[in-house]
Regions:
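PLP-dependent amino-acid enzyme catalytic core
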Residues: 1-348
Length: 348
Protein backbone atom coordinates (compact mmCIF):
# COMPACT_ATOMS: atom_id res chain seq x y z
CA UNK A 1 0.00 0.00 0.00
CA UNK A 2 1.12 3.52 -0.85
CA UNK A 3 -0.55 6.60 0.58
CA UNK A 4 -0.35 10.29 -0.20
CA UNK A 5 -1.91 13.00 1.96
CA UNK A 6 -2.94 16.07 0.03
CA UNK A 7 -1.77 18.88 2.31
CA UNK A 8 -2.49 21.64 -0.18
CA UNK A 9 -4.84 24.36 1.12
CA UNK A 10 -8.38 23.59 0.02
CA UNK A 11 -9.80 26.31 -2.19
CA UNK A 12 -12.82 26.42 -4.43
CA UNK A 13 -11.44 24.89 -7.63
CA UNK A 14 -12.07 26.17 -11.11
CA UNK A 15 -13.49 22.86 -12.22
CA UNK A 16 -13.96 21.90 -15.83
CA UNK A 17 -17.42 20.44 -15.18
CA UNK A 18 -20.70 21.20 -13.41
CA UNK A 19 -20.97 19.59 -9.96
CA UNK A 20 -24.75 19.86 -9.93
CA UNK A 21 -27.26 17.07 -10.65
CA UNK A 22 -30.12 19.26 -11.86
CA UNK A 23 -29.76 18.53 -15.59
CA UNK A 24 -29.15 14.78 -15.30
CA UNK A 25 -31.97 14.47 -12.76
CA UNK A 26 -34.34 16.22 -15.16
CA UNK A 27 -33.50 13.61 -17.79
CA UNK A 28 -33.73 10.72 -15.33
CA UNK A 29 -37.18 11.87 -14.22
CA UNK A 30 -38.42 10.72 -17.65
CA UNK A 31 -36.64 7.36 -17.47
CA UNK A 32 -39.01 4.53 -16.49
CA UNK A 33 -36.23 2.29 -15.13
CA UNK A 34 -34.57 4.95 -12.99
CA UNK A 35 -34.78 4.46 -9.25
CA UNK A 36 -32.41 5.61 -6.55
CA UNK A 37 -29.88 2.90 -5.74
CA UNK A 38 -29.79 1.59 -2.16
CA UNK A 39 -27.18 2.40 0.47
CA UNK A 40 -27.46 -0.20 3.23
CA UNK A 41 -25.63 0.14 6.51
CA UNK A 42 -23.31 -2.84 7.07
CA UNK A 43 -23.27 -2.87 10.86
CA UNK A 44 -21.70 -6.30 11.28
CA UNK A 45 -18.91 -5.52 8.84
CA UNK A 46 -18.29 -2.16 10.52
CA UNK A 47 -17.85 -3.96 13.83
CA UNK A 48 -15.45 -6.44 12.25
CA UNK A 49 -13.40 -3.61 10.74
CA UNK A 50 -13.37 -1.60 13.96
CA UNK A 51 -15.26 1.48 12.74
CA UNK A 52 -18.46 3.03 14.08
CA UNK A 53 -20.56 2.80 10.91
CA UNK A 54 -20.21 1.61 7.33
CA UNK A 55 -22.57 2.56 4.50
CA UNK A 56 -22.29 0.93 1.05
CA UNK A 57 -23.81 2.75 -1.92
CA UNK A 58 -24.73 -0.16 -4.20
CA UNK A 59 -24.55 0.71 -7.89
CA UNK A 60 -24.87 -2.88 -9.09
CA UNK A 61 -28.45 -2.47 -10.31
CA UNK A 62 -28.24 1.09 -11.62
CA UNK A 63 -30.84 1.34 -14.41
CA UNK A 64 -30.28 -2.31 -15.36
CA UNK A 65 -26.80 -1.46 -16.64
CA UNK A 66 -24.93 -2.66 -13.59
CA UNK A 67 -22.81 0.32 -12.57
CA UNK A 68 -22.65 4.03 -11.76
CA UNK A 69 -21.48 4.63 -15.33
CA UNK A 70 -25.13 4.49 -16.39
CA UNK A 71 -25.38 8.03 -15.02
CA UNK A 72 -22.62 9.46 -17.22
CA UNK A 73 -22.34 8.19 -20.78
CA UNK A 74 -26.07 8.06 -21.52
CA UNK A 75 -26.55 11.58 -20.15
CA UNK A 76 -23.69 12.88 -22.29
CA UNK A 77 -25.22 11.26 -25.39
CA UNK A 78 -28.56 12.91 -24.62
CA UNK A 79 -27.02 16.34 -24.07
CA UNK A 80 -24.98 16.19 -27.26
CA UNK A 81 -28.02 15.16 -29.29
CA UNK A 82 -29.97 18.07 -27.81
CA UNK A 83 -27.16 20.50 -28.61
CA UNK A 84 -26.93 19.25 -32.20
CA UNK A 85 -30.69 19.53 -32.71
CA UNK A 86 -31.15 22.79 -30.83
CA UNK A 87 -33.80 21.31 -28.53
CA UNK A 88 -34.07 20.53 -24.82
CA UNK A 89 -35.67 17.09 -25.09
CA UNK A 90 -33.58 14.37 -26.78
CA UNK A 91 -36.73 12.38 -27.51
CA UNK A 92 -37.77 15.21 -29.84
CA UNK A 93 -34.50 14.95 -31.78
CA UNK A 94 -34.76 11.49 -33.33
CA UNK A 95 -34.02 12.71 -36.87
CA UNK A 96 -30.85 14.43 -35.72
CA UNK A 97 -29.85 11.50 -33.54
CA UNK A 98 -30.16 9.12 -36.48
CA UNK A 99 -27.31 10.96 -38.20
CA UNK A 100 -24.96 10.71 -35.20
CA UNK A 101 -22.51 7.92 -34.38
CA UNK A 102 -20.78 7.89 -31.00
CA UNK A 103 -17.50 6.02 -30.65
CA UNK A 104 -15.53 5.31 -27.50
CA UNK A 105 -13.03 2.96 -25.96
CA UNK A 106 -14.17 1.35 -22.74
CA UNK A 107 -13.18 -1.13 -20.08
CA UNK A 108 -16.84 -2.17 -20.13
CA UNK A 109 -19.26 -0.03 -18.19
CA UNK A 110 -18.76 3.33 -19.92
CA UNK A 111 -19.22 1.68 -23.30
CA UNK A 112 -22.40 0.02 -22.10
CA UNK A 113 -23.78 3.37 -20.94
CA UNK A 114 -22.93 5.11 -24.23
CA UNK A 115 -24.42 2.21 -26.20
CA UNK A 116 -27.61 2.25 -24.13
CA UNK A 117 -27.95 6.02 -24.50
CA UNK A 118 -27.49 5.78 -28.26
CA UNK A 119 -30.16 3.08 -28.49
CA UNK A 120 -32.66 5.00 -26.35
CA UNK A 121 -32.30 8.26 -28.24
CA UNK A 122 -31.93 6.86 -31.77
CA UNK A 123 -28.22 7.25 -32.48
CA UNK A 124 -25.56 4.69 -33.38
CA UNK A 125 -22.70 3.54 -31.15
CA UNK A 126 -19.35 1.91 -31.85
CA UNK A 127 -17.54 0.60 -28.78
CA UNK A 128 -13.90 -0.50 -28.73
CA UNK A 129 -13.13 -3.02 -26.00
CA UNK A 130 -9.53 -3.70 -24.94
CA UNK A 131 -8.43 -7.32 -24.99
CA UNK A 132 -8.58 -7.58 -21.19
CA UNK A 133 -12.32 -6.82 -20.98
CA UNK A 134 -14.45 -9.86 -19.99
CA UNK A 135 -16.53 -11.38 -22.79
CA UNK A 136 -19.73 -10.71 -20.85
CA UNK A 137 -19.38 -6.99 -21.58
CA UNK A 138 -19.04 -7.68 -25.30
CA UNK A 139 -22.34 -9.57 -25.30
CA UNK A 140 -24.19 -6.99 -23.21
CA UNK A 141 -23.02 -4.11 -25.39
CA UNK A 142 -23.92 -5.92 -28.61
CA UNK A 143 -27.39 -6.55 -27.17
CA UNK A 144 -28.04 -2.79 -27.32
CA UNK A 145 -27.43 -2.84 -31.08
CA UNK A 146 -24.01 -1.22 -30.85
CA UNK A 147 -21.06 -2.36 -32.93
CA UNK A 148 -18.19 -3.78 -30.88
CA UNK A 149 -14.59 -3.70 -32.10
CA UNK A 150 -11.80 -5.56 -30.34
CA UNK A 151 -8.82 -3.48 -29.27
CA UNK A 152 -5.47 -4.11 -27.59
CA UNK A 153 -4.58 -2.19 -24.42
CA UNK A 154 -6.89 0.48 -23.03
CA UNK A 155 -4.67 3.32 -24.24
CA UNK A 156 -4.34 1.72 -27.68
CA UNK A 157 -8.14 1.45 -27.82
CA UNK A 158 -8.54 5.14 -26.98
CA UNK A 159 -6.19 6.02 -29.84
CA UNK A 160 -8.18 3.73 -32.13
CA UNK A 161 -11.44 5.45 -31.16
CA UNK A 162 -9.96 8.87 -31.91
CA UNK A 163 -8.72 7.65 -35.29
CA UNK A 164 -12.08 6.16 -36.25
CA UNK A 165 -13.88 9.34 -35.22
CA UNK A 166 -11.56 11.44 -37.37
CA UNK A 167 -11.79 9.11 -40.37
CA UNK A 168 -15.57 8.70 -40.32
CA UNK A 169 -16.89 11.96 -38.91
CA UNK A 170 -18.08 10.21 -35.76
CA UNK A 171 -18.33 11.74 -32.29
CA UNK A 172 -15.64 10.61 -29.90
CA UNK A 173 -17.09 10.37 -26.38
CA UNK A 174 -14.36 9.37 -23.94
CA UNK A 175 -14.73 9.43 -20.18
CA UNK A 176 -11.09 10.46 -19.97
CA UNK A 177 -9.94 14.00 -20.77
CA UNK A 178 -6.77 15.77 -21.81
CA UNK A 179 -5.66 19.19 -23.02
CA UNK A 180 -7.99 20.24 -25.82
CA UNK A 181 -10.54 17.53 -25.04
CA UNK A 182 -12.60 18.34 -21.94
CA UNK A 183 -16.13 19.44 -22.86
CA UNK A 184 -17.56 16.00 -23.62
CA UNK A 185 -16.03 14.21 -20.60
CA UNK A 186 -17.32 17.09 -18.46
CA UNK A 187 -20.88 16.01 -19.26
CA UNK A 188 -20.09 12.51 -17.98
CA UNK A 189 -18.78 13.80 -14.65
CA UNK A 190 -21.86 16.00 -14.35
CA UNK A 191 -23.98 12.87 -14.56
CA UNK A 192 -22.06 11.24 -11.72
CA UNK A 193 -23.12 14.03 -9.35
CA UNK A 194 -26.50 12.27 -9.11
CA UNK A 195 -24.88 9.51 -7.05
CA UNK A 196 -23.56 11.99 -4.50
CA UNK A 197 -26.88 13.83 -4.35
CA UNK A 198 -28.66 10.57 -3.55
CA UNK A 199 -26.19 9.87 -0.75
CA UNK A 200 -26.69 13.36 0.65
CA UNK A 201 -30.43 12.83 0.77
CA UNK A 202 -29.95 9.54 2.59
CA UNK A 203 -27.60 10.99 5.19
CA UNK A 204 -29.79 14.04 5.72
CA UNK A 205 -32.76 11.79 6.46
CA UNK A 206 -30.66 9.88 9.02
CA UNK A 207 -29.14 13.09 10.40
CA UNK A 208 -25.84 11.22 10.28
CA UNK A 209 -22.97 12.11 7.97
CA UNK A 210 -19.81 10.14 7.18
CA UNK A 211 -16.39 11.15 8.40
CA UNK A 212 -14.75 9.31 5.49
CA UNK A 213 -15.86 8.70 1.90
CA UNK A 214 -13.85 6.14 -0.08
CA UNK A 215 -13.93 6.53 -3.88
CA UNK A 216 -12.18 4.22 -6.33
CA UNK A 217 -10.55 5.65 -9.43
CA UNK A 218 -9.52 4.54 -12.89
CA UNK A 219 -9.17 7.71 -14.95
CA UNK A 220 -10.78 9.45 -11.96
CA UNK A 221 -14.25 10.37 -13.19
CA UNK A 222 -16.29 8.82 -10.38
CA UNK A 223 -13.98 10.16 -7.69
CA UNK A 224 -13.91 13.66 -9.15
CA UNK A 225 -17.63 13.90 -9.90
CA UNK A 226 -18.70 12.69 -6.47
CA UNK A 227 -16.01 14.62 -4.57
CA UNK A 228 -16.94 17.86 -6.32
CA UNK A 229 -20.60 17.51 -5.38
CA UNK A 230 -19.63 16.68 -1.78
CA UNK A 231 -17.47 19.78 -1.49
CA UNK A 232 -20.09 22.05 -3.03
CA UNK A 233 -23.28 20.68 -1.49
CA UNK A 234 -22.82 18.54 1.63
CA UNK A 235 -23.35 20.46 4.90
CA UNK A 236 -20.94 18.19 6.80
CA UNK A 237 -17.60 17.64 5.13
CA UNK A 238 -15.86 14.22 5.23
CA UNK A 239 -12.34 13.15 4.49
CA UNK A 240 -12.34 12.08 0.84
CA UNK A 241 -10.09 9.11 0.11
CA UNK A 242 -9.26 8.07 -3.48
CA UNK A 243 -8.27 4.45 -4.10
CA UNK A 244 -6.32 3.09 -7.10
CA UNK A 245 -4.75 -0.23 -8.08
CA UNK A 246 -1.05 -0.30 -7.27
CA UNK A 247 -0.60 -1.47 -10.86
CA UNK A 248 -2.23 1.69 -12.25
CA UNK A 249 -1.39 4.52 -9.83
CA UNK A 250 -1.88 7.38 -12.27
CA UNK A 251 -3.61 9.78 -9.86
CA UNK A 252 -1.36 9.27 -6.85
CA UNK A 253 1.70 9.61 -9.10
CA UNK A 254 0.26 12.79 -10.59
CA UNK A 255 -0.55 14.26 -7.18
CA UNK A 256 2.99 13.61 -5.98
CA UNK A 257 4.45 15.15 -9.14
CA UNK A 258 2.07 18.10 -9.24
CA UNK A 259 1.23 17.34 -12.87
CA UNK A 260 -0.36 14.56 -14.90
CA UNK A 261 1.94 11.55 -14.78
CA UNK A 262 1.47 8.04 -16.14
CA UNK A 263 0.87 5.19 -13.71
CA UNK A 264 2.47 2.27 -15.51
CA UNK A 265 2.40 -1.37 -14.43
CA UNK A 266 1.16 -4.86 -15.34
CA UNK A 267 -2.52 -5.63 -15.85
CA UNK A 268 -4.68 -5.47 -12.73
CA UNK A 269 -7.65 -7.64 -11.77
CA UNK A 270 -9.45 -4.35 -11.16
CA UNK A 271 -10.24 -4.14 -14.85
CA UNK A 272 -12.44 -1.04 -14.77
CA UNK A 273 -9.77 0.79 -12.73
CA UNK A 274 -6.77 -0.42 -14.73
CA UNK A 275 -6.11 2.92 -16.43
CA UNK A 276 -2.55 4.17 -16.75
CA UNK A 277 -3.42 7.81 -17.59
CA UNK A 278 -5.69 9.98 -15.44
CA UNK A 279 -8.33 12.34 -16.78
CA UNK A 280 -7.15 15.96 -16.82
CA UNK A 281 -10.37 17.45 -15.44
CA UNK A 282 -10.56 14.74 -12.77
CA UNK A 283 -6.96 15.39 -11.71
CA UNK A 284 -7.52 19.14 -11.52
CA UNK A 285 -10.67 18.75 -9.42
CA UNK A 286 -9.21 16.15 -7.07
CA UNK A 287 -6.16 18.36 -6.57
CA UNK A 288 -8.47 20.61 -4.52
CA UNK A 289 -11.20 18.20 -3.40
CA UNK A 290 -9.50 14.99 -2.21
CA UNK A 291 -7.65 14.50 1.07
CA UNK A 292 -5.89 11.14 0.80
CA UNK A 293 -4.81 8.86 -2.06
CA UNK A 294 -4.26 5.14 -1.45
CA UNK A 295 -3.11 2.29 -3.67
CA UNK A 296 -4.23 -1.29 -3.08
CA UNK A 297 -3.09 -4.69 -4.32
CA UNK A 298 -5.04 -7.04 -6.54
CA UNK A 299 -5.16 -9.51 -3.67
CA UNK A 300 -6.70 -6.93 -1.32
CA UNK A 301 -9.35 -6.02 -3.90
CA UNK A 302 -10.26 -9.67 -4.50
CA UNK A 303 -10.59 -10.28 -0.77
CA UNK A 304 -12.76 -7.17 -0.39
CA UNK A 305 -15.04 -8.44 -3.17
CA UNK A 306 -15.41 -11.76 -1.36
CA UNK A 307 -16.20 -9.93 1.88
CA UNK A 308 -18.93 -7.86 0.23
CA UNK A 309 -20.39 -10.95 -1.40
CA UNK A 310 -20.63 -12.54 2.04
CA UNK A 311 -22.69 -9.52 3.10
CA UNK A 312 -25.06 -9.77 0.13
CA UNK A 313 -23.35 -7.36 -2.26
CA UNK A 314 -22.10 -9.20 -5.35
CA UNK A 315 -19.37 -7.22 -7.07
CA UNK A 316 -15.91 -7.40 -8.62
CA UNK A 317 -12.47 -6.34 -7.37
CA UNK A 318 -13.09 -2.99 -9.10
CA UNK A 319 -16.40 -2.58 -7.33
CA UNK A 320 -14.89 -3.52 -3.98
CA UNK A 321 -11.84 -1.26 -4.22
CA UNK A 322 -13.36 1.28 -1.84
CA UNK A 323 -13.68 -1.34 0.88
CA UNK A 324 -10.12 -2.50 0.24
CA UNK A 325 -8.97 1.10 0.64
CA UNK A 326 -10.87 1.44 3.90
CA UNK A 327 -9.27 -1.72 5.25
CA UNK A 328 -5.82 -0.52 4.17
CA UNK A 329 -6.23 2.94 5.70
CA UNK A 330 -7.77 1.61 8.96
CA UNK A 331 -9.45 4.82 10.17
CA UNK A 332 -10.14 5.44 13.87
CA UNK A 333 -12.78 3.54 15.81
CA UNK A 334 -15.22 6.46 15.83
CA UNK A 335 -15.16 6.80 12.03
CA UNK A 336 -18.36 6.70 10.00
CA UNK A 337 -17.42 5.42 6.57
CA UNK A 338 -19.07 5.34 3.15
CA UNK A 339 -17.95 3.21 0.23
CA UNK A 340 -19.29 2.93 -3.30
CA UNK A 341 -19.86 -0.58 -4.63
CA UNK A 342 -19.39 0.76 -8.12
CA UNK A 343 -20.58 -2.24 -10.13
CA UNK A 344 -22.32 -5.57 -9.83
CA UNK A 345 -20.92 -8.88 -10.98
CA UNK A 346 -19.45 -9.04 -14.48
CA UNK A 347 -22.29 -11.24 -15.72
CA UNK A 348 -24.89 -8.56 -14.97
Amino acid sequence: MTTFTNARPKTTPQRGFRASPDRPLALLARCPVHIETPMPELADLAKTLGVAQLFAKNEGKRMRLGSFKALGGAFAVAQMICEAAGVEDPVAAKETAATMTFVTASAGNHGLSVAAGAKIFGARAVIILPSTVPAAFDARIRATGAEVIGGQSYDDSVAQAIRLADENGWIHLSDGSWAGYTARPALILEGYSVLSAECAGHFAALNTWPTHVFLQAGVGGLAAGVAAHIRDHWPVQPNIVVIEPDRAPCLINSMKAGALTMGDGPDSNMGRLDCKNASLIAFEALWADADIFVTITDEAAAQAAATLAAHGLATTPSGAAGLAGLIALAPAADSRCMIVVSEGSENG
